[in-house]
């Protein structure tokens, strides 16, 4: 289902989401960068609304790749949750040509998110010899799409047989929708198994937990962005989790956007942060299952917020948790954590981890 964001709702949404995965410390640089990002997002949404209309604002997110081109008149939207690819244009002249070009580029784009600006209309998508969507989409003959010739033929088929149109009240929107293969999630996950195993061995974090976090955070979308400016497969925030990891590794500053958009670096950083939560921030919790529940919840909402569910005193909170069964800890975190998002997050990650453990 498309995510429609009205400009009037952008600012409060940005503010309410800005604390996610921040932990418990704030710094001036983070606030300054976040305010700048909020302004950028507001301007970006305003540009889209002016062209597409109030109810047609679609912006990239953790599980949605959205790229605008043609002076914001054409967009490609990959919904990694639903497994759909929608190419749309409101171009007044030769809309089919605009759609055809966008279809081909989307099908053949690579997997280097650092080279693509999702917050502009710059046409910076390059055709790759190893398309990111290869194997996740098949053409009308049931074949995967690697080369431009096959992508072009499929685009022509789509325009002839699946072209749709609707009105936004002022202009006509032309679109085609492509369904991804049923196991598209597994296809994407497979791309990163080697990186996950390497990070798992390096930091002592279970592979199934890393995969479950990736699925929940981004649905294995390497282009993942968020309103809190979390980046990449594991949705790492530069100035919070990223900075903590760098400091623990003896590095100064914060990881760059290009660093966090690199899949291997993102997985390494996200896994390192999971290890920090487990071995440093929440090490007072004795039972490994109880601690895992706390770590999962803390990855979303911070370690401090997890402990405060049980007591405002961190040591006392750990002591209370240690008197409880893992089931009681899970029940408490999924019902009493102040953040509804964090309550749901523990359920989602725990469920996903069970599925990866069975494989």
UniProtKB/Swiss-Prot annotation:
How is the protein disposed in the membrane?
Lipid-anchor
Q: Where is the lipid attached (N-palmitoyl cysteine)?
A: 17
> What reaction does this enzyme carry out catalytically?
Exolytic cleavage of the (1->4)-beta-glycosidic linkage between N-acetylmuramic acid (MurNAc) and N-acetylglucosamine (GlcNAc) residues in peptidoglycan, from either the reducing or the non-reducing ends of the peptidoglycan chains, with concomitant formation of a 1,6-anhydrobond in the MurNAc residue
Give EC number(s), comma-separated: 4.2.2.n1
Function, as annotated, reads: Murein-degrading enzyme. May play a role in recycling of muropeptides during cell elongation and/or cell division.
Give the HAMAP family listed for this entry: MltC
Q: What name is this protein filed under?
A: Membrane-bound lytic murein transglycosylase C
